């Protein structure tokens, strides 16, 4: 099952690049015709499909309440001989959206406007991330880094259907204030007879603050170190033992720690009730002083580049500006923030370090990978690991109740 993969469902702003957007002029080119140009057909189909389904939904009145059938519903379209724009889109493809009314309702509860969501996915092609699950799970981010697009398996789609009603009810009850993944859309794309399933979530990390270090934490210490291959990446995903061996702590202060752990406990109890396990806490750390230094270096380079571009009369785009063949956007221009500042309505998982912390940091923390039920395969894996490591070892495949308890205890110990 693809859910056995460990993966990172957040995409960080790459160091030494995010700050370019502050100094470069932004030229947003509004196109009369949308051209869903991307480096590969599957992404063009995703852009076309999200654009189509959001447009269709805009004509459907918002119901007073969701009905049981909404959790089984889908919309699908088959496109044949699509001659218009054929240099970008395949001539034949199919696009299916699962539970459109439910995900529209979830987007609203998470404070995400459908027009903004549509623009983020369709205005410019999604960007590949170097984050990848062991089973080849693929991650992309929308051009503005606000949303993450993840390929999933048909089993994951089935599990989403299994939990969606209870997940939606939980989001209603907590008013969208949760550390759980914010599921915003689920799709099936068929190109050349190959089916690809994709889920869109809010990015855990900031769309503008650089993440300098990140961790995938499960509360388990058996085989929980980053591989040498992972460590060679620009922004490796470190694990539990790496975190402990570094003596790392997240300095949030007593009040923030209390509030965070209360939210975490509620979320994790919900997952245990659903018999879900193997989830992680994804942690990203933004070093404010380091970011300021990087920004100064980037600004110097950006000014030189701007002079060169202005010299040849070309309009200079910011790192996620509109290419000349992309649809325009209604999103407002980003506000300017001071070092380490963020908009809590956008960076919903962000938390500042306490003023007494040794370094000024911003932490991004959320639960990821919640589509792993405790089924027969997990029970067999648990038995095998218990034989290998002993009954007392902190292996990752324990039952959901044990997993949630251990998870909460570990997270309580890393916050200070």
Swiss-Prot record:
Signal peptide: none annotated. ATP binds at residues 202-204, 214. Its EC number is 2.7.1.149. It catalyses: a 1,2-diacyl-sn-glycero-3-phospho-(1D-myo-inositol-5-phosphate) + ATP = a 1,2-diacyl-sn-glycero-3-phospho-(1D-myo-inositol-4,5-bisphosphate) + ADP + H(+); 1,2-dihexadecanoyl-sn-glycero-3-phospho-(1D-myo-inositol-5-phosphate) + ATP = 1,2-dihexadecanoyl-sn-glycero-3-phospho-(1D-myo-inositol-4,5-bisphosphate) + ADP + H(+); 1,2-dihexadecanoyl-sn-glycero-3-phospho-(1D-myo-inositol-5-phosphate) + GTP = 1,2-dihexadecanoyl-sn-glycero-3-phospho-(1D-myo-inositol-4,5-bisphosphate) + GDP + H(+). The modification N-acetylserine is found at residue 2. Ubiquitinated by the SPOP/CUL3 complex. Ubiquitination is stimulated by PtdIns5P levels. The modification Phosphoserine is found at residues 19, 326. The keyword GTP-binding applies. InterPro entries: PInositol-4-P-4/5-kinase_C_sf, PInositol-4-P-4/5-kinase_core, PInositol-4-P-5-kinase_N, PInositol-4/5-P-5/4-kinase. One of its GO terms (molecular function) is 1-phosphatidylinositol-5-phosphate 4-kinase activity. Keywords: Acetylation, ATP-binding, Cell membrane, Cytoplasm, Endoplasmic reticulum, GTP-binding, Kinase, Lipid metabolism, Membrane, Nucleotide-binding, Nucleus, Phosphoprotein, Transferase, Ubl conjugation. Coiled coil: none annotated. GTP binds at residues 203-204, 214, 369. It is found in: Endoplasmic reticulum membrane; Cell membrane; Nucleus; Cytoplasm. The modification N6-acetyllysine is found at residues 94, 150. It is an enzyme of class 2 (transferase). Residues 38-415 form the PIPK domain. GO terms for biological process: 1-phosphatidyl-1D-myo-inositol 4,5-bisphosphate biosynthetic process; autophagosome-lysosome fusion; negative regulation of insulin receptor signaling pathway; phosphatidylinositol metabolic process; positive regulation of autophagosome assembly; regulation of autophagy. One of its GO terms (cellular component) is autophagosome. The modification Phosphothreonine is found at residues 8, 322. Homodimer. Binds TNFRSF1A. Interacts with PIP4K2A; the interaction suppresses ubiquitination by the SPOP/CUL3 complex. Probably interacts with PIP5K1A; the interaction inhibits PIP5K1A kinase activity. PANTHER family: PHOSPHATIDYLINOSITOL 5-PHOSPHATE 4-KINASE TYPE-2 BETA, PHOSPHATIDYLINOSITOL-4-PHOSPHATE 5-KINASE. Participates in the biosynthesis of phosphatidylinositol 4,5-bisphosphate. Preferentially utilizes GTP, rather than ATP, for PI(5)P phosphorylation and its activity reflects changes in direct proportion to the physiological GTP concentration. Its GTP-sensing activity is critical for metabolic adaptation. In collaboration with PIP4K2A, has a role in mediating autophagy in times of nutrient stress. Required for autophagosome-lysosome fusion and the regulation of cellular lipid metabolism. PIP4Ks negatively regulate insulin signaling through a catalytic-independent mechanism. This is Phosphatidylinositol 5-phosphate 4-kinase type-2 beta. It comes from Mus musculus. The lineage of its organism: Eukaryota, Metazoa, Chordata, Craniata, Vertebrata.
